[in-house]
Amino acid sequence: ISSPNRRGIIEMFEYLYDKIVSIYHDKEPLINVIAWYGLETVNRTGGDEIKQWNCIIFLRSKHRPECYYAQGKKGLLISPAIAEMCGVFPIVREEDLDKITAKKITQIYKEVSLSQEQLKALTDQTS
């Protein structure tokens, strides 16, 4: 979500949040949110800077992937929060360094994110 003003981004977030709540069937929605305000682009000819409010909402199906609970070789201590959902994967155990791969990260994203069907239901509501 992007808006040149604070009120606009709040209104859009509230609108989307109401729609998001409906796909979780009266349970608290599992979401990660990152928001920021600041320089988005610079006019290279020396003109005005463009500043805007921004927000990304990551819709979740569950808090932790199965590998978080697994033991032995299948265990991987990853519990995606906002850093991981934004593409930064801090590895807290040395033993997990050799286990993490692009394929495993993709699998974790798919496991903890909403399914295609749930996303379609949400986009149908907001169209």
Predicted regions and their residues:
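HIT superfamily nucleotide-processing domains
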Residues: I1-S127
